[in-house]
Amino acid sequence: MKSIVAKVLAVAAAMTLAACAVQPATHADLPQTVKTVAPDAWSVDAPKDTVGADAWWSQFGDPTMHRLVDIVLGDNLDVKAAVERVKQAQDITKQQRAALAPQLDAGATAAYQRQNTPPPLGYVKQAGVGLTASWQPDVFGGERLAVLAAQAQVTGRQSALDELRLALAANTAAAYIDLRWAQAQLQIINDNEQIRSRALKLTQERLQYGLSTQLDVARAQNQLQDLQAQIPKIRSDIQHDMSLIAVYSGRTPESVGSLLIDEARPIPVPAQSVPQTLPSEALLRRPDVRTAYATVEQRAAEVGVARADRYPKFRLSLSDGILASSYLGMPTLTDNLFSVALSATSPIFNAGRITAHIDENESRMRESQLGLQQTMLNALKDIEDTRSDLVNGDAQVAKLAGALDASGHALRLSNELYKGGASSFLDVLAAQEAYLRDAESLNQAKREHAQAAVALYRSLGGGWDAPADGDVAKTQPSTDVAAN
C-alpha cells in the first residue's frame, strides 16, 4: 500500500512540475500574421501566365545570362560565407541540445609525495581512477526553450542565405542587362557616327561646288565630334559592368574574359506575363519575410528562457572510483570512492534583475513583430511597384519602337531633300538629333523593361528553394569549362 501511495505522489509531483514549465511568449504563426496584412488581390492588373518564379533568369531566353547566374550562385564568396554562418547556427543548436543530456567524465590520478606531517609516513604512493556523472534536469523548460531559440536562429540564417542568393541573382541579372545596354549604346553611337560622317562628307562636297556653306560644314563637324566624345565613357561603363559580374562570380576583374561576356548581344527580353500568385502567397515565399518571422520566434523563445530564471535549478551529481595508497612499506590499501549529491538553487533577492531581463526580452519580441509587419508592408509595395513598371515598360517599348521607325524615315527624307536642295542642313541636323534621341530612348526603355522584370521576380521571392528542416543548401562550384 505504501509503495502505491509513493508512486501516486511521485506521478503527481512530476505532473505538477510539468505544469510549471515555462512556454515561449505567445504569437501568431506566419500564415496568420500574413493574413492580417496581405490584401485579397493586387491593385495593379498584369497579364498572368503559368510562368514560375523559380530559376526566373532562365525565362529571359538568354543562355549567357542563365549560365552567368548559375555560376555566380555557385561560386560567389558571400554565399559561401553565408553557408558557413548557417552551419555555425546549427552547431550552436547542437550545443544547446547537449545541455539537456547528462554528462559523463572519466578521471585518473597518480601521486608520489613525501608526507612529514605527524605521524610521518615517508613517501606515499597514490593512484586512482573514477567516473563522474552530472545532470541538470530541465524541470521548468528553460534549456528546452534555449534549444528552440537556437533552432529559430538556424531558420533565420537559412532564410538570410536564401535572401542573399535571391539578391545576388537579381544583381547579376541587372549587371548583365546594364552590360548589354552599354554595348547596344555603343553600337548606336557607332551607327550614328557613320551617319554623321556621311553628312559631313556631303557638306564638304557641296561646299566645293558652292552648294553649301562653311557654317554647314562646321555644324556637321560639331555634331560628329560631340557624338564621338561619348564613346570613351560608354566603353568605361562596359568595363565596369564586366568587372562587377566577375567579382560577383568570385573572380578577379582581370579574368572577366573567362565568362565569355565581352561579345555584344541584345538586351534580354522578359516574358510579357507575371507569375500567378496571391499577395499572401508572395509574402510567404519571400525570404526576408521568413527571416523576420524567424526573429520573432527566436525572441519569443528567449522570453521563455528569461522567465525560467525565476524558478529553482537542480543538479544531480554521481561519482564512483578506486583509490590505491601505499606508504611505510605496508601493503597497498584500496578504497572505493562513491558519492551522490543533489543540489538546488533558487533566486530569492536580485534587486529586480530577473524581472528587468524578462521585460527586456518581451520588448525585443514586440520590436521584432513590428519589424515583421514593416517588412511585409515594404514587400507589398515592392511587388505592386514592379508590376506597374513591367506593364508600363512594355507599352513604352512598343511606342518608342514606332517613334524610332518614324524618325529613321524622317532622317532619310531630310537627307534626300538636302541633296536635292529642297531643304537646309538644319533640317538634316534636327533629323539626326531626333533619330539618335529615339534610338537611345528605345535602348533605355528596353533596359528599364528588363530591369523591371528582374525586380518583379526578386520582389516575388523567386529564385530559391526552401530547404528541408536542418539541411544547409549546398554550394557547388561551377563547371564552367572556359573558367577552368
What is each stretch, according to the model?
Residues 2-74, 151, 235-284, 290, ...:
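Terminal intrinsically disordered/low-complexity segments used for targeting and assembly
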Residues 3, 143, 159-278, 389, ...:
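Periplasmic alpha-helical coiled-coil/stalk elements that build and connect Gram-negative outer-membrane
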Residues 122-126, 333-337, 438:
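Transmembrane beta-barrel outer-membrane domains
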Residues 207-211, 418-422, 459-463:
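A short glycine-centered flexible hinge/capping loop motif at secondary-structure junctions
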Residues 21-171, 313-318, 348-358:
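Short flexible linkers and secondary-structure junctions
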Residues 127-135, 175, 278, 338-342:
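Hydrophobic, lipid-facing positions within transmembrane beta-strands of outer-membrane proteins
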Residues 111-115, 241, 321-325:
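Structural signature of outer-membrane beta-barrel domains
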Residues 80-81, 97-98, 137-165, 215, ...:
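Sec/SRP-type N-terminal targeting helices
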